[in-house]
């Protein structure tokens, strides 16, 4: 299979996983008696994004090929999301917030690193194949947005917006992507000679130095505000 087509499928599934529940889970949480906790379900995504991508990024750089780490994260995330959905379906109106939220949080914790890993995999494979990442990656990434929209519509048209089934679908797509990444994507060798970094550098905290540049500071501030508004809407 052509490398670009492989990456298109990967990006499509990557964001299709997210689109199954991101815009619709509040319609399930409210009637299920968890309406007052909806904010927590969205905010925990940002919380785990602070440290989980860094931890798995370090592992992918040094010990595990990036495409395998991507597969393992999606497999874990898919299983936890499917478990959350299955629990919600079986519990019905008596679903316990603590149990459901714990399963959901674990699913999100393993999904968030895959956003950065998917970009790393795509860039590495394009470079290995002799492609220009600046020119060739954007058309591939567009299919991620297409995947998000398609899965969002699918959940809407099937009437699963108000059901825990949306999390089961999320888990199924995540598991599918895990198998796809593990068995079809080319291998990305790990870097054995990665230079040792300080704790600050390993966590990427040195990036805050960019705030010294006015243009970058304005860009980051408005990006954060945009991220907040996206979660609210």
Indicate where each model-derived feature is located.
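Helix-loop boundary and gating motifs at the non-cytosolic
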Residues: 1-49, 215-223, 227-233
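Hydrophobic core of transmembrane alpha-helices in multi-pass small-molecule transporters
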Residues: 12, 80, 93-116, 224-225
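Helix-to-loop junctions at the C-terminal end of transmembrane segments
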Residues: 51-65, 158-160
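Cytoplasmic membrane-interface "Motif A"-like loop-to-helix N-cap segments
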Residues: 61-75
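Cytoplasmic helix-loop-helix junction between adjacent transmembrane helices
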Residues: 105-143
């Amino acid at each position: 299979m052509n490398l670009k087509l492989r990456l298109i499928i990967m990006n499509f599934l990557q964001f299709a996983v997210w689109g199954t529940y991101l815009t619709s889970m509040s319609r399930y949480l409210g009637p299920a008696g968890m309406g007052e906790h909806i904010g927590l379900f969205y905010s925990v995504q940002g919380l785990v994004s602070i440290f989980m991508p860094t931890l798995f990024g370090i592992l992918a750089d040094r010990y595990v090929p990036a495409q395998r780490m991507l597969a393992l994260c999606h497999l874990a995330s898919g299983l936890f999301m499917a478990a959350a959905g299955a629990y919600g379906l079986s519990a019905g109106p008596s679903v316990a917030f603590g149990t459901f939220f714990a399963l959901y949080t674990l699913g999100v914790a393993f999904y968030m690193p895959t956003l950065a890993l998917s970009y790393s995999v795509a860039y590495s494979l394009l470079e290995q194949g002799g492609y220009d990442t600046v020119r060739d990656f954007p058309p591939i990434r567009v299919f991620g947005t297409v995947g998000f929209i398609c899965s969002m519509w699918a959940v809407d048209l099937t009437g699963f917006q108000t059901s825990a089934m949306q999390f089961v679908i999320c888990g199924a797509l995540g598991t599918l992507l895990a198998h796809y990444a593990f068995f079809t994507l080319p291998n990305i060798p790990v870097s054995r000679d990665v230079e040792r970094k300080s704790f600050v550098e390993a966590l990427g905290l040195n990036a805050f130095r960019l705030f010294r540049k006015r243009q970058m500071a304005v860009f980051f501030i408005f990006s954060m505000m945009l991220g907040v508004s996206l979660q609210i809407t």
